A protein has these predicted regions:
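Nucleotide-sugar donor-binding/catalytic module of glycosyltransferases
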Residues: 1-142
């Protein structure tokens, strides 16, 4: 859920800088707790860092198109059933680097963690296995 009415205007303002290829922003949980989203510490080994490229996420379409289709899928050829966001956020950040990425500090999204169908509530073991597999994949080269 968008946190405020001017979220898209704020994001558009960020993209006025032609050097911005992708963003991630800050969120709050539905009960008011602050979320964990923040900019990565460095653009080196982002797959080994605590995952912080969270809601709300945006990117240039051409950047998305650089992701290999097979990296968006599991070993059975199916799109990742859980934790699939890592399969596209890691490659796009690796290709962008810190200089083409912007973290939006303003809270722009409310995350409904009360949903009983959240992946981490339904099958945390599968989430952890998938996270490990995606983190173990080859990194992308910076563009």
């Amino acid at each position: 859920v968008l946190f405020r009415s001017n979220v898209f205007g704020l994001i558009n303002k960020v993209y006025e800088d032609p050097n911005v290829w992708m963003t991630s922003g800050s969120f709050k949980y539905h009960d008011g707790r602050p979320g964990f989203a923040k900019a990565p510490n460095t653009d080196i080994d982002v797959r080994k860092q605590t995952f912080t490229l969270s809601h709300m996420r945006t990117w240039k379409s051409w950047l998305w198109k650089q992701i290999k289709e097979e990296d968006l899928r599991d070993e059975k050829g199916q799109y990742w059933g859980v934790a699939g966001d890592l399969s596209f956020m890691f490659p796009m950040f690796e290709m962008s680097g810190l200089q083409n990425y912007r973290h939006i500090n303003d809270v722009i999204y409310t995350y409904n963690e009360s949903n009983p169908l959240n992946d981490h509530k339904v099958n945390m073991k599968k989430v952890m296995e998938t996270v490990h597999k995606i983190r173990s994949m080859n990194s992308y080269k910076k563009l």
